[in-house]
């Protein structure tokens, strides 16, 4: 009976998690934002036999943070993002073709593993069956983070790798050397999914050192829990799995972390500088903001990280129980890796990635902590009920615990469904803009070799099939330099996501001579803030770009034929 239970419950959790992610996919099957577009674009290039090469620049850190001396397309892929989210799609694309199902299916299947893993780590840590089951259910439907779990992005991929590595690390502290060794391979895969996966490796390294330090201080009374061979095997497996990719980075880019070497990742004052090629990314520029703004930005990054985690993973309501459970488990070997990783992750993002935290950098990594957090939530609920019941004679501890545990899961279901509906609606609006622009280019007879400038170059590539470059957050003369360097033929502007330099154009104002009349535009909807927009304002428009001497599309003679709108 026991073996059947051990297999049945995690299997049911796995099936439930797949079902949740399948519903998400059916409701919104497409990639939704630059990260997921990028991973799909690279995957399709790999599947087509073109290797790690792409014909667009989604951000200029991919080519050194400026217009290179030899501005060419295609370029080597993954100078900033890591390759695993693209690699896992390739077999499915070969099998099913370049479809949305082929790109999302690996993330649905792999991400669903986190639910039974939450159950397993809870039981391995000595938690009750109710706690383990509740944690598995919450991981299957992770509150306000639910909408992201079927995207061809790292949410579904990174989470089980981090959970597995931290779980294996905890087992290592209890004397399971093989588990600790296996963690090295999981850390390598996590790092190939996200570069800050290396922080999980730092966590395990610190645990290994601390374990041997305690043994040394005991004067030989206590032996290390983690055998030396396990530590060596852990490091060896990491190098074996991740080493080839880092060798590729050194060969292609001359750096283990090409984007970081530009300074644009760490040495920017505000997130708006991330997409600029004129603002310097130097130590002098970074420190020149002054001590006050520097400290304020770091504190702001920490506050943003805590808020994002509390809202998306905890739905705010579950956070108090998460903290109670954390306090009860503060000395638990099973949770030591998760607690240490959480501290490192929050500190690292606050100190080094502060301005990137609100843009999604943090939650992509922090999602790996969700299953451990949900175990703590369920234990916190049980402890809270027990505390109240001890002071209220009329309470039935068993029944009350069951009711409040069920309420937590019900809250996650309702919150996850509501978040998915609203988030998908926002994504659908952006997709409509992409589709509008792609249809305009097709209607104009633009060859697929034409290059396009847009704020989301990876999304433009996905929807229109045309490569190009990102619209940089710089003055129009700099934008023109980029257009000339890369022989851009078209410009897509979207009011929902634009840089300040093009605001007058979206408002129907004057255009520079190298930007022609729009071939298609959609009139601006009334402002939600009540601010009246100027006559002629548009929400999305496609303009010809004339940087070649013989290009006459931007002349006044073509204005009558070039203006208009698509249905």
Language-model segments: what does each one mean?
Residues 11-15, 130-133, 185, 202-208, ...:
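Signature aromatic-anchored transmembrane alpha helix within multi-pass, membrane-resident enzymes
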Residues 4, 212-216, 296-346, 380-383:
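Hydrophobic, aromatic-rich transmembrane alpha-helices
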Residues 12-19, 139, 185-187, 316-321, ...:
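Transmembrane alpha-helix segments characteristic
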Residues 115, 155-158, 190-193, 199-202, ...:
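Hydrophobic/aromatic-rich transmembrane helices and adjacent perimembrane loops
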């Amino acid at each position: 009976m026991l073996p059947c239970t051990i297999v049945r419950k995690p299997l049911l959790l796995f099936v439930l998690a797949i079902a949740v992610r399948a519903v998400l996919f059916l409701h919104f099957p497409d990639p939704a934002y630059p990260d997921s577009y990028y991973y799909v674009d690279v995957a399709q290039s790999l599947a087509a036999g073109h290797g790690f090469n792409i014909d667009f620049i989604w951000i200029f850190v991919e080519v050194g943070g400026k217009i290179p001396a030899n501005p060419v397309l295609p370029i080597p892929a993954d100078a900033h993002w890591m390759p695993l989210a693209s690699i896992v799609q390739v077999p499915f694309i070969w099998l099913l073709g370049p479809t949305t199902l082929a790109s999302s299916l690996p993330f649905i299947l792999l991400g669903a593993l986190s639910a039974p893993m939450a159950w397993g780590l809870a039981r391995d840590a000595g938690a009750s069956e109710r706690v383990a089951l509740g944690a598995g259910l919450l991981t299957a439907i992770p509150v306000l983070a639910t909408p992201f779990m079927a995207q061809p992005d790292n949410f579904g991929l990174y989470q089980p790798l981090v959970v597995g590595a931290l779980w294996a690390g905890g087992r290592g502290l209890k004397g399971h050397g093989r588990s600790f060794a296996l963690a090295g391979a999981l850390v390598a895969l996590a790092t190939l999914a996200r570069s800050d996966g290396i922080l999980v490796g730092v966590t395990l390294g610190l645990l290994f050192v601390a374990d041997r330090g305690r043994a040394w201080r005991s004067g030989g009374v206590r032996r290390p829990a983690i055998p030396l061979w396990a530590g060596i095997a852990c490091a060896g497996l990491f190098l074996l799995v991740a080493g080839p990719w880092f060798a590729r980075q050194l060969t292609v880019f001359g750096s283990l972390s090409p984007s970081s070497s530009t300074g644009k990742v760490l040495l920017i004052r505000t997130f708006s500088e991330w997409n600029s090629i004129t603002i310097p990314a130097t130590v002098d520029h970074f420190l020149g903001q002054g001590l006050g703004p520097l400290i304020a930005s770091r504190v702001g990054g920490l506050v943003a990280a805590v808020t994002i985690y509390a809202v998306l993973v905890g739905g705010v309501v579950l956070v108090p129980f998460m903290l109670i459970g954390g306090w009860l488990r503060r000395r638990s070997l099973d949770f030591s890796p998760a607690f240490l990783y959480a501290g490192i992750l929050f500190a690292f993002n606050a100190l080094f990635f502060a301005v990137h935290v609100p843009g999604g950098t943090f939650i992509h990594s922090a999602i790996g902590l969700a299953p451990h957090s949900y175990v703590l939530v369920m234990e916190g609920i049980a402890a809270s009920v027990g505390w109240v019941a001890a002071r209220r004679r009329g309470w039935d501890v068993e029944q009350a615990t069951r009711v409040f545990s069920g309420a937590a899961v019900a809250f996650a279901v309702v919150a996850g469904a509501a978040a998915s509906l609203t988030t998908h609606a926002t994504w659908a609006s952006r997709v409509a803009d992409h589709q509008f622009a792609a249809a305009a280019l097709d209607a104009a007879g633009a060859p697929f070799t034409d290059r396009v400038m847009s704020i989301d170059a990876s999304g433009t590539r996905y929807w229109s099939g045309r490569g190009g470059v990102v619209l940089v957050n710089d003055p129009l003369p700099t934008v023109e330099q980029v257009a000339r360097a890369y022989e851009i033929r078209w410009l897509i502007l979207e009011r929902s996501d634009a840089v300040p330099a093009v605001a007058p154009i979206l408002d129907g104002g004057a255009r520079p001579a190298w930007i022609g009349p729009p071939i298609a535009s959609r009139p601006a909807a009334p402002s939600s803030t009540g601010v009246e927009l100027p006559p002629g304002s548009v929400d999305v428009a496609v303009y010809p770009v004339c940087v070649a001497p013989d290009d006459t599309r931007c002349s006044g003679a073509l204005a009558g034929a070039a203006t208009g709108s698509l249905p």
